[in-house]
Amino acid sequence: MPVRKQDTQRALHLLEEYRSKLSQTEDRQLRSSIERVISIFQSNLFQALIDIQEFYEVTLLDNPKCVDHSKQCEPVQPGNPWESGSLSSAAVTSESLPGGLSPPVEKYRYQDEEVLPSERISPQVPNEVLGPELVHVSEKSLSEIENVHGFVSHSHISPIKPTEAVPPSSPIVPVTPALPVPAESPVVLPSTPQANPPPVLVNTDSLETPTYVNGTDADYEYEEITLERGNSGLGFSIAGGTDNPHIGDDSSIFITKIITGGAAAQDGRLRVNDCILRVNEADVRDVTHSKAVEALKEAGSIVRLYVKRRKAFRKNHEIKLIKGPKGLGFSIAGGVGNQHIPGDNSIYVTKIIEGGAAHKDGKLQIGDKLLAVNSVCLEEVTHEEAVTALKNTSDFVYLKAAKPTSMYINDGYAPPDITNSSSQSVDNHVSPSSYLGQTPASPARYSPISKAVLGDDEITREPRKVVLHRGSTGLGFNIVGGEDGEGIFISFILAGGPADLSGELRKGDRIISVNSVDLRAASHEQAAAALKNAGQAVTIVAQYRPEEYSRFEAKIHDLRETMMNSSVSSGSGSLRTSQKRSLYVRALFDYDKTKDSGLPSQGLNFKFGDILHVINASDDEWWQARQVTPDGESDEVGVIPSKRRVEKKERARLKTVKFNSKTRGDKGEIPDDMGSKGLKHVTSNASDSESSYHEYGCSKGGQEEYVLSYEPVNQQEVNYTRPVIILGPMKDRVNDDLISEFPDKFGSCVPHTTRPKRDYEVDGRDYHFVTSREQMEKDIQEHKFIEAGQYNNHLYGTSVQSVRAVAEKGKHCILDVSGNAIKRLQIAQLYPISIFIKPKSMENIMEMNKRLTDEQARKTFERAVRLEQEFTEHFTAIVQGDTLEDIYNQVKQIIEEQSGPYIWVPAKEKL
């Protein structure tokens, strides 16, 4: 019997009667479920479905009404008419819908095997007694794991039952189970009528009433995410808990940071602001922060996370722009093969150019997703195709864009952002929160607007409380200040450290207090002691004061210039030559004689990497030297500052405690990270992103910080072609260009692995396949590998012998490794040509890689600074340039000059 409106009204009346009888406390959950079903019956969508059914039954199936003067319509046969029965039970399922409207479940299941549904459908939290069933295992291709990370991830995609979800194209909202059954959980449905609601999942898990943030269960979607713990953990950070609510009074455990390269980032489904409900079988709702951390630590190697997140709603809008002298006036990022947001091929607006057409119009905003330009669709296209479509437009351009929305409106903090720690040309990430929430009137927490876009006036200037949990590397930031009551400021945030992962501290913050210890008038030493002795959980009250910090920086800069240009009173004014000492050194800094007013006689200019023949080193303050060029020694003799003078002046300049600097030991020591326990942080492409930072703190026992000045060298003849290691921004482009332009001069070596050989692979061509893991671990401990890592429980590494094999064939072996590998090659008597690309500024980086946003350029610049600080003494040369072509030409020239057969290598003697 067909369902009519009067049947719906009768069912609604029965439900309301039944609800009125549920007055007991134990009936609360059932009452809530009934109220939700009642709201469904009263919704416009449900009424529209009834109208469609009546039209279907009365009009389309009535043959006489289908007759036309020109032709006769065939009657439409119902594929699956509504079953007979009373609606009093409200048993509406996807199988009980009209045949013409029921979702193509089997077809979608087939599609699900080919397309990861994580972006379209979020599976519900499964029943507690069921483990994850694997229907698809995501495995990266061989080419994608050539550069092995220590972070490992396999995506375990849980099955999506046919009655639990429908494709995005279907407007039908599945509702299950039949009511009234008290054991079932509330139905997840929109609480307000929607013209075209997205697919909604039915929550049939056994969780009790969940904790909500400014919304009801209908505002959320649920997902089970299975991660395989890598050697560096799960790759995300959390905040919240009953003892430290993250948002308002909500004690939920929130994801605050996705670490690039980690298990979560490679899986791609977990997002910032996701709320963790359960870790494996451990319920982490309404627990303390430490309990949540403990649950994650004890979860084992395979970790099932049950999360909820606010549903994403986007509002499409059309924009008409008139091209001006500056064109359309905005920049884009993203596209197939160049994802701006992990797992999303969409084209995003990353920059609005002041004075351009988009800026004048005011409707297009950073973070908007472009759907079409004129009649050209921009969904699932490459970056180049999108650029071409935008370029090939007339003066009048019609854009269709989706406005990203924010999750929380009434919060003034800037968002914690996802940063990419290995800056490549395709690194363009904005906060994944661009998926979520409502459009804010101003920049709000977890809005898609990155920190780089927010002006200083848009960041809260009020004091705020930040709780950090000290890691193995300390708190992860530097402080400066503390003289004459000027305050203590944060001058540097270490990428990947606790401060960076929290996302709540920034350069320019003034520290007001630490664990209730007032630091407003503290000296630098007092602030350092307070931070060092604060324990594991450190509560910091900070206030963003960029103007004060800028004035402080300017004062430090002026002081630095004064000190470097001043004459040191201890200098004798003339050289003492009673005991002449001659040696060859390599300069580890640039020196401009015009800026040194204390010179006793004519000075000698030099740059980093220059070889100097010191012909008189008897004076404590000044040496006499000649410059050594590829053509021989120069005739010009000049005065240079001695090692002692350089180090004394630099230590005076650096009279600050650096919480992220490591105390350098003897440079001749082998880095103690090549044992099997060290594999987790010895990765093959960490050169742009990772450095080995020890515990932050002051120098102990009066030990002075290592200062770069000169390195003693000897000339040596080599009978091999030197390996090449290029570090810094744009290194991958330079490496590729070298191999492409000179395939006969540059090559790569074959790595080793303990992974079993695949059918199409050839031993010695694709990999050197090692049958014994124990043997490879032993070789690693014996320093036979310059770098090694673990992926999917298999070891991968680059051996000294593989590099030597390429070198002995007369080719430069291009190595994509970290700075640590330079020292290991030197110990193996394979002296590499190591070149550091030093960016001039953030603007310089953005000019060479126009796809980067301001924030990404800043992060790239900071990584380059840390890289230079960590490995400067190992660099053969440092290059700078305004363009990539300029840098490439310098690199080629350096390689040609340093190829040998006579090269300068570090000497064993000390200065």
From Swiss-Prot:
Point out the coiled-coil segments of this chain: none
Residue ranges of every copy of the L27 domain listed in the record: 4-64
**What CDD domains does the record tag this protein with?**
GMPK, PDZ1_Dlg1-2-4-like, PDZ2_Dlg1-2-4-like, PDZ3_Dlg1-2-4-like, SH3_DLG1
Q: Does the keyword rRNA-binding apply?
A: no
Disulfide bonding pattern of the chain: none
A Pfam family that this protein carries is SH3_1
Biased composition annotated in UniProt, kind: Polar residues: 83-96, 419-441
Q: Show where the Guanylate kinase-like domain sits.
A: 721-896
Q: Which residues form the SH3 domain?
A: 580-650
Q: What GO terms fall under cellular component here?
A: apical plasma membrane; basal plasma membrane; basement membrane; basolateral plasma membrane; bicellular tight junction; cell junction; cell projection membrane; cell-cell junction
Q: How is it modified after translation?
A: Phosphorylated by MAPK12. Phosphorylation of Ser-39 modulates transport to the plasma membrane. Phosphorylation of Ser-232 regulates association with GRIN2A. Ubiquitinated; by MARCHF2 which results in its degradation.
Cross-referenced Gene3D superfamilies:
2.30.42.10, Guanylate Kinase phosphate binding domain, Helix hairpin bin, P-loop containing nucleotide triphosphate hydrolases, SH3 Domains
- Consequence the record notes for mutating residue 232 to D: Partial loss of association with GRIN2B
Tell me, in a sentence or two, what this protein's role is: Essential multidomain scaffolding protein required for normal development. Recruits channels, receptors and signaling molecules to discrete plasma membrane domains in polarized cells. Promotes epithelial cell layer barrier function via maintaining cell-cell adhesion. May play a role in adherens junction assembly, signal transduction, cell proliferation, synaptogenesis and lymphocyte activation. Regulates the excitability of cardiac myocytes by modulating the functional expression of Kv4 channels. Functional regulator of Kv1.5 channel.
**Name of the protein this chain belongs to:** Disks large homolog 1
Task: Provide the species name.
Answer: Rattus norvegicus
